[in-house]
């Protein structure tokens, strides 16, 4: 289970996440994490949060982003806000380490589930070379966390009609939204911070 101080790594995407605030610790008000991304790391697939505002504070490096139709660069000290429901993606746009603090308001336990599972899959080498999940695994997880995140492709109508079927098939083949091995040591490190 993710809690304050939990640190999770995604070796396939070159990212590390350090949890600063959870749904439980903030009474559902704020999920906050520090993201560290190596140069050339994963470009986060375009997605939207149907019920949350997301805020990014650049701590170090060069933060590349696309929010709606606007592409930009954030530098240390910049704060970038993505309104509820607006499609966005992000990447390390510089030659060095990128560190951002990001916040989701309100906090949803499904966000914690998403990161725990996605980063766990990466640690086991189960992501595609692009950093995406395999189709059936993605359908299972994305159906479970659809209050937190919706990808922008395929279109929402296709997801709404097809993902329930794909998720059911995925569950029959053993895919899960939550794997207990990802939520207990050594899958996550509690740094006691």
What are these regions (language model features)?
Residues 27, 38-41, 62, 106-110:
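Short, charged/polar surface micro-motifs in flexible loops or helix N-caps
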Residues 34-36, 62-64, 101-103:
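Residue-level recognition of well-ordered beta-strand positions that form the cores
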Residues 84-114:
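Ligand-binding loop in jelly-roll beta-barrel domains
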Residues 9-46, 52:
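A short glycine-rich, His/Asp/Glu-containing loop-to-beta-strand
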Residues 51-63, 68:
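Glycine- and acidic-residue-biased ligand/ion/polar-headgroup-sensing regions
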Residues 55, 69-87:
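Short acidic-glycine-tyrosine-enriched beta hairpin
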Residues 110, 114-193:
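Alpha-helical membrane-targeting segments
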């Amino acid at each position: 289970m993710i809690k304050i101080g939990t640190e999770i790594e995604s070796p396939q995407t070159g990212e590390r996440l350090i949890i600063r605030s959870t749904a439980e610790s903030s009474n559902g008000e704020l999920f906050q994490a520090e993201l560290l991304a190596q140069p050339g790391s994963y470009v986060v697939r375009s997605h939207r949060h149907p019920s949350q505002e997301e805020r990014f504070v650049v701590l170090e490096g060069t933060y590349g982003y696309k929010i709606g139709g606007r592409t930009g660069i954030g530098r240390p000290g910049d704060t970038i806000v993505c309104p509820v429901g607006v499609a966005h993606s992000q990447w390390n746009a510089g030659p060095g380490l990128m560190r951002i603090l990001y916040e989701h308001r309100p906090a949803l336990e499904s966000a914690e589930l998403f990161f725990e599972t996605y980063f766990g899959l990466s640690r086991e080498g189960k992501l595609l070379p692009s950093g995406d999940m395999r189709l059936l695994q993605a359908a299972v997880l994305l159906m479970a966390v659809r209050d937190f995140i919706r990808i922008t492709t395929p279109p929402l109508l296709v997801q709404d009609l097809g993902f329930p079927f794909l998720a059911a098939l995925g569950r029959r083949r053993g895919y899960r939204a939550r794997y207990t091995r990802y939520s207990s040591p050594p899958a996550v490190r509690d740094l006691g911070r």
